């Protein structure tokens, strides 16, 4: 899996979880301490999050880290 595929999957999962939990970019930014421009970069598939960012986002969205980085059967 390359970086582009990784960003695509993470972004799609993040967008879905944000919607399920009623968060917009500004709210997620405020709750996680991640800048809004960085959250936007995640959602626009331009920035790969650090492990710390993934854990912080999972905590705020009250989900397992695996829900954000679930790649299904795509890992070879």
Where are these regions (language model features)?
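A short, Lys/Arg-rich alpha-helix, primarily the initiator
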Residues: 1-23
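Residues within the helices of the helix-turn-helix
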Residues: 15, 26, 55
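The alpha-helix within a helix-turn-helix
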Residues: 18, 29, 58
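Residue-level detection of the helix-turn-helix DNA-binding "recognition helix"
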Residues: 19, 33, 44, 73
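Short alpha-helical DNA-recognition segment
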Residues: 22-41
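Residue-level signal for the short linker/turn that defines the boundary of a DNA-recognition helix
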Residues: 23, 49-52
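DNA major-groove recognition helix of helix-turn-helix
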Residues: 43, 61, 69-72
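DNA major-groove recognition helix of helix-turn-helix/homeodomain DNA-binding modules
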Residues: 52-67
